[in-house]
Swiss-Prot record:
It comes from Azoarcus sp. (strain BH72). GO terms for biological process: translation. GO terms for molecular function: ATP binding; glutaminyl-tRNA synthase (glutamine-hydrolyzing) activity. The keyword Metal-binding does not apply. Disulfide bonds: none annotated. Belongs to the amidase family. GatA subfamily. The lineage of its organism: Bacteria, Pseudomonadati, Pseudomonadota, Betaproteobacteria, Rhodocyclales. The keyword DNA damage does not apply. PANTHER family: GLUTAMYL-TRNA(GLN) AMIDOTRANSFERASE SUBUNIT A (PTHR11895:SF151), TRANSAMIDASE (PTHR11895). Keywords: ATP-binding, Ligase, Nucleotide-binding, Protein biosynthesis. This is Glutamyl-tRNA(Gln) amidotransferase subunit A. GO terms for cellular component: glutamyl-tRNA(Gln) amidotransferase complex. It catalyses: L-glutamyl-tRNA(Gln) + L-glutamine + ATP + H2O = L-glutaminyl-tRNA(Gln) + L-glutamate + ADP + phosphate + H(+).
């Protein structure tokens, strides 16, 4: 039952092989046993989970269950949850209990999913290793001396270790896809605006997007279907017809399920910088795609090399504005001793924020300051437009773009802690997708040295989530990398 897919759990619940309460208890007990070694969870809501499970059992008995009714999951700790701590991995919000649910949380509650708790994350989603959390580093289930990736490292590690079958995440520059790659799970970031950001604590508002983690593309499709949907409370949320992503996974007729699919391989993604073990796994995955009927074509993303510098101007600029609301006045950490109001602001923020958050606030404030706005922020926005245009030129030649999710496998905890630039470069293949607002997915495609997972990234055109999920699903029907477990 622990390793069952969401569809298998659905059948077990519907046929009364197991109850929602029994299933929730099974995973809660597993969290209690395994989480101390992984630190994947910040908050475990046993009482709330069992209450939700009892309600799910009532829905099943009444014949009104949906695909996720009674299925356990966890939320990244930046989604507001009514009555439950929402810390964003920060001392600043260590005692913050949200008075309302995020849109994603309320949709999943309505679907009958059972939330077991809140997962650990890089502080305010700023990081690529899950080492900046106020609650300590998350450890990779495949090797607990290594990072799981970030910033959604807790969600990725929880799914990889089967502490939960599903988890939510957020992706600003790769924060779903990169940890999915490092922990051997599947993760998808949809098109910007497909998932509401209401109640999702902001890092960089023009880049942030909620995403989904599961063992497989099928599991992610079921979760994303429930998460996505128009929300008038988020001005960037797109009012468009709802999609059933799971329904799009049906195979095409014939022995070559991906016949006719054109996969673009950006030459910039396969240049220097990719580790040999990652390259070998990615090449083998592409061979498997060709065997399934896809054809590969070389494309170019000439401005891809500028994505990281552009991102580290735009994202900190937006963060410096978004995080100005955390001042110790109405909620959040307040310094115990201060002289006047200005001193209270300074001390509360100095004590409440960690080093990486302070670094990005300083950078963001600098690039928005008088005399530097045109030189940095405006130029970065121009680069962003060029990157988006590069993708559109590439999609004129292909249906899906593929490449490595990360240039290396997971590194040792502490290895890059004192070198922010090296940490930032771990997202070199993922950041451009956020700058362009495109959907991206990472799925397991093999192992590198030390049996550390490697992920393949698939990038789609706008609203191409169904195609990405269906493409990954066909690969997973012909391979078993997504079935491998750390144990």
């Amino acid at each position: 039952m622990i390793n069952a897919s969401v569809s298998e759990l659905r059948r077990a619940l519907d046929t009364r092989q197991v109850s929602s309460v029994e299933l929730a208890t099974l995973f809660l007990d597993r969290i209690a046993e395994r989480n101390p070694a992984l630190n994947a969870f910040i908050t475990i809501d046993r009482e709330g989970a069992l209450a939700a499970a009892r309600a799910a059992d009532a829905r099943i008995a009444a014949g009104t269950a949906g695909p996720l009714t009674g299925i356990p999951l966890a939320h990244k700790d930046l989604f507001c949850t009514e009555g439950v701590l929402t810390t964003c991995g920060s001392k600043m919000l260590a005692d913050f209990v949200s008075p309302y649910d995020a849109h994603v949380v309320s949709r999943l509650k309505d679907a009958g999913a059972v939330s077991l708790g809140k997962t650990n994350m890089d502080e305010f989603a700023m990081g690529s290793s899950n080492e900046s959390s106020h609650y300590g580093a998350v450890r990779n289930p495949w090797d607990t001396t290594r990072i799981p990736g970030g910033s959604s490292g807790g969600s990725a590690a929880a799914v990889a270790a089967r502490l939960v079958p599903l988890a939510t995440g957020s992706d600003t520059g790769g924060s779903v896809r990169q940890p999915a790659s490092h922990t051997g799970v599947t993760g998808i970031k949809p098109t910007y605006g497909v998932v509401s950001r209401y109640g999702m604590i902001a890092y960089a508002s023009s880049l942030d997007q909620g995403g989904a983690f599961g063992a497989s593309a099928e599991d992610c499709a079921l979760l994303l279907t429930a998460m996505a949907g128009f929300d008038p409370r988020d001005s960037t949320c797109l009012d468009r017809p709802a999609e059933d992503y799971a329904a799009a996974l049906a195979p095409t007729a014939g022995g070559k399920p991906l016949a006719g699919l054109r996969i673009g391989l950006p030459r910039e993604f396969f240049a220097e910088g990719m580790a040999d073990d990652v390259r070998a796994a990615v090449d083998a995955a592409l061979d498997q795609y060709r065997a399934l009927g896809a054809v590969t074509v070389e494309v170019s993303l000439p401005n891809a090399k500028l994505a990281v510098p552009a991102y580290y101007v735009i994202a900190p600029a937006e963060a410096s504005s978004n995080l100005s609301r955390f001042d110790g006045v109405r909620y959040g950490h307040r310094a115990a001793e201060y002289g006047d109001l200005n001193d209270m602001y300074c001390k509360s923020r100095a004590e409440g924020f960690g080093a990486e958050v302070k670094r990005r606030i300083l950078v963001g404030t600098y690039v928005l300051s008088h005399g530097y706005y045109d030189a940095y922020y405006l130029q970065a926005q121009k680069l962003r437009r060029l990157i988006a245009q590069d993708f559109q030129a590439a999609f004129a030649q292909c249906d899906v773009i593929a490449g490595p999710t990360s240039p290396t496998t997971a590194w040792a905890i502490g290895e890059k802690a004192d070198d922010p630039v090296q940490m930032y470069l771990s997202d070199i293949y993922t950041i451009a997708v956020n700058l362009a607002g495109l959907p991206g997915l990472s799925h397991p495609c093999g192992f590198g040295a030390g049996r550390l997972p490697v992920g393949l990234q698939l990038i789609g055109n706008y609203f191409g989530e169904s195609r990405l999920l269906a493409t990954a699903h066909q690969y997973q029907q012909a391979s078993d990398w997504h079935l491998q477990r750390p144990e």
